[in-house]
Amino acid sequence: DELKFENINGKEVLYHKSVIKGDSSKNLLPVIVEKFISSLSFGKSMRWGGFSYEFIRPIRSVVAILGSELVDMEIYGVKSKMAFYPHRNYGYDMVEFGSIDEYFTALENNGIILQASKRRQKILNEFKAIEQNSGLKIELDEDLLDEVVAITEMPTALIGSFEEEFLEVPSEVIVTSMKENQRYFPLYDQNGKLSNHFVVVSNAISSDSNLIIKGNEKVLRARLSDAKFFWESDLASEFSSAKLKNITYLAGLGSMYDKEIRERDIARELAKIYEKELKYEFGGDFIDELDRAVMLSKADLTTAMVYEFTDLQGIMGS
């Protein structure tokens, strides 16, 4: 009796009609929140304790308030409370609060800026102050900025430096090491040249900022020492595409060397088609130059630098 037929636009449709009684927001909220949390997808997730739950980081506390009332709910084994964990520099015991107004005040008093927009603005304000005091310009990478906003609770921007001798290494290598390995922001002089300074956005709260700076300088120095070693090793080695024979391109399609040979053949055929235009642009020896350019286009895949910093593929060869 619950199934019915109805003619819709000349087609007979079988359907079921039911009325679901509404429920209170307080009862619906736990279900909605749990579905939302479960729907989130990350590149990498983790498990913790003896649980089978997966999330980007362990869930340690849950605050769920509707109006002025605590919503009784449990997310991934953690029950909601009128309490939260403070910033690690403030201690490890939960901080209790009595109302939503007290909650926001208690957070900031315990080293946590809840709103991402406020954390972002704090970082940008401190970036501006660093630029004014140093006379240098910060390269504002929006993706990196979003990342440091997301991983800090009370961000503080600090300026550090490294030895000028590392500037002998190509700037692309230094910047890549800073941004990808350490989440640092590079600083440039007024002429757009990379300086031996960087900005770190720290989540540590300390009265001695020099201690934080020195620690980050030590880590970066080790990274740049490795990069300098790779760079000097590559300079001492022959830059040859013959080494590409040891790198597989795709199963059934040979090595990267085979791919390069095919590309050189294609380039020569295209050069014949556009011979007149290319001669006018590059002169009579353009075919030899074109062939050499294609031959060297993949050669940096064999370098230690590209092996360590894969994003520099194509850049190191140039």
Residue ranges and their predicted role:
Residues H16-V19, E108-I112, F127-Q132, V199-S206, ...:
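Glycine- and acidic
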Residues K21, Y53, G67-V71, G77-S80, ...:
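Short, glycine-/Ser/Thr-/acidic-enriched flexible segments
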Residues S38-M46, V71, I113-A116, Q132-L140, ...:
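Intrinsically disordered or highly flexible coil/loop and linker segments, enriched in small
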Residues E139-I261:
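Catalytic nucleotidyl-transfer cores of nucleotide-processing enzymes
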Residues D258-K259, L270-S318:
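Divalent metal-dependent catalytic cores for phosphoryl transfer on phosphate-bearing substrates
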Residues D1-E165, I174:
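Long, basic N-terminal domains or extensions that often function
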Residues V148, L220, L244, A267, ...:
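Short alpha-helical scaffolding segments that buttress acidic/His motifs in well-ordered protein cores
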